[in-house]
Amino acid sequence: EPRVNATVILASSELPDEGARIGGGTYLAKPGSYRVGGLRIEGFAAPHDRVGGRRFGQATVWRWQQAGLNFAHLGGTAAKLSGEDKVLLGRPDVLIIGVGGGGKVYNGEEAAEVVRALNPRRVIPVQYVNGEAPSGCDQGGVQPFLDAMSGMKVRNVGPNLNLPGNLGDNTVIEVMR
């Protein structure tokens, strides 16, 4: 398990296979408005799965502004975005989105559809397997998402990402490995 320290940890839910409290900092998992470390963070409920939340309940989708950039973190959700979701999220500068598939996370095609709908300037794919999936894991790798986003600029940035204040108008996918 990673040992990290952060000012705030945003979790999609508190299901046993996600939302583990492994680092220090303020832990948020429920919808609401929060102020943490000078940030105003808003979380709202969205179905966790493709059947309106009937299988895994509701997830929390996050948005906040930091260093002049608007962030949206869709975390663990596999539900189609509703019109209301699109209004609440707006056009984020930075979209953090699960792409590995499985029961609670967008697959590559679904994630690409969300990216096209929100038109962010930067996309950070998360919740995918890097290498071979462990036994029993229902998630896949990032490549199906990258294939679905064919023609989009992709940068492999490693474990750290620094964003400039001006991101430009075109979408760039930032793959952290």
What are the roles of these predicted feature ranges?
Residues 60, 85-88, 110-114, 141, ...:
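A general structural detector for well-ordered alpha-helical segments in enzyme core domains, enriched
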Residues 16-21, 132-134:
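Short, charged/polar "capping" segments at the starts of alpha-helices
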Residues 40, 122-177:
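Binuclear metal-ion centers of metallo-dependent hydrolases, dominated by the metallo-beta-lactamase
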Residues 81-82, 103-109, 132-137:
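Extracytoplasmic/secreted cell-surface and envelope-processing proteins
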Residues 1-8, 15-17, 24-90, 94, ...:
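Core dinuclear metal-dependent hydrolase active-site scaffold
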Residues 14-15, 128:
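Residue-level marker of positions within ordered structural domains that often coincide
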Residues 6, 92-96, 108-128:
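Proline-aspartate-enriched helix->loop->beta-strand connector
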